[in-house]
C-alpha cells in the first residue's frame, strides 16, 4: 500500500531562511546520527521518517559514517526514500558530510579533495541519489590546506552532486576564511553546523553567530538536547534503557562522567524553569536555541516517532523573559560537553 504524507504538514512547521540564501529550512530538522543503523529496526526508522515529514520536517541530515556500521544510515535512508518518499524528493532537503574515519588507509578521512569527493560519490550511491542538497566538510583537518577543502566543496557544487555546501565544527576564524575561499570559486557558504545547547555554549562565547550573520551564513545546531541530558531522563540517575547506560565511555558519546554535580544542579534548575513555562525541559531547550533568529534550524534525533510530536510543540513558545534569560546566564554552568572541541579549536 502506497504511503501518503499528511496534506496539512506545512501548516504546523515554521521555516526560516538559511542566512542570506533563498533556501528555507524547517525550524526543527531530523538528524540520523543515531537510531538509523543496521542494528536498528527498519520499521522503527520508517515510522520516525514518516512522522517527521507529516509534521513538516523537510530536512534530513546524514553523514557518511552514521550507523553503526558506518554507511548504514545512508543505506537505510536510501531504501526508505525509494519505498516511501520517492514522490516527495523535491520537497526534501537531504544533507550528508565527510570528515571522520570512513575506510582504511590514508585516504579514508580528513579534508583532502581525494577523500571528500570519493566520499560524496559513495554517499550518493548508498542513498540512490543523483545529488544531495547540502554537502558538508564534517570537521577541520589541520593537515590539509583549507584551499584544498574549499576546492573540493566547490567542485561538488559545480559537478551537480551538491546544491549547497556547509561546514561543521569550524572556529569563527576558520569559518571566515572558508567564506572567503569559497567566494573565490563564486560559491557561497550556505551553513555551519556547530554543537550548541544550554550546557554547551561555545558558539556564544566564540562569537560564531556574529561571524555567520556578518557573512550571510545560516546556522543549524546539533546536540540541542546534549545527547539526552536536557530531556530530564537523567535527573534521578542513569536509567537502564538509556543511551548513557548502553554507550558507556564511547568517544563523542553520552558518558556517566558528564553527570557532574554541577551539571545535575543545572538540570534541576532548568527543569524547574521549564515547568514554570508549561514546557518539558526538552521543549524549553529547543525554544532557547530558536529564540535567536540567527539560528536557522535545530537538529533533533528520535528513537520513537512520538518524541517528534513533543519536540514540535516547542515552537509554540519561543519567547523568554529578561528574568528567565538572566537566570540561565547566571546559574547554568558550562557543562564541558563540547566533544567536538578538537575541531573547533584548530
UniProtKB/Swiss-Prot annotation:
Up-regulation conditions: Expression is not significantly altered upon methylglyoxal addition. Expression is decreased in dose-dependent manner with glyoxal treatment.
InterPro entries reported in the protein's UniProt record: GAP_reductase (IPR047628), K_chnl_volt-dep_bsu_KCNAB-rel (IPR005399), NADP_OxRdtase_dom (IPR023210), NADP_OxRdtase_dom_sf (IPR036812)
Annotated GO MF terms: oxidoreductase activity, acting on the CH-OH group of donors, NAD or NADP as acceptor
Reactions accelerated catalytically: a primary alcohol + NADP(+) = an aldehyde + NADPH + H(+); hydroxyacetone + NADP(+) = methylglyoxal + NADPH + H(+)
Keywords assigned by UniProt, alphabetized: NADP, Oxidoreductase
EC number(s) on file: 1.1.1.-, 1.1.1.2
Outcome of gene disruption: Cells lacking this gene show 23% decrease in the amount of acetol. The deletion mutant shows sensitivity to glyoxal.
Positions marked as site (Important for catalysis): 61, 66, 97, 138
A GO biological-process term: DNA damage response
Enzyme class: oxidoreductase
Binding site for NADP(+): 33, 61, 66, 168, 193, 223, 225, 227, 233, 303, 307, 311
Family, as annotated: Belongs to the shaker potassium channel beta subunit family.
Subunit structure: Homotetramer. Homooctamer.
Chain's role: Aldo-keto reductase that catalyzes the stereospecific, NADPH-dependent reduction of L-glyceraldehyde 3-phosphate (L-GAP) to L-glycerol 3-phosphate (L-G3P). The physiological role of Gpr is the detoxification of L-GAP, which may be formed via non-enzymatic and/or enzymatic racemization of D-GAP. Also contributes to cellular methylglyoxal detoxification by catalyzing the NADPH-dependent conversion of methylglyoxal to acetol. However, the catalytic efficiency of methylglyoxal reductase activity is more than 2 orders of magnitude lower than the L-GAP reductase activity.
Protein name, entry field: L-glyceraldehyde 3-phosphate reductase
UniProt organism field: Escherichia coli (strain K12)
Gene designation per UniProt: gpr
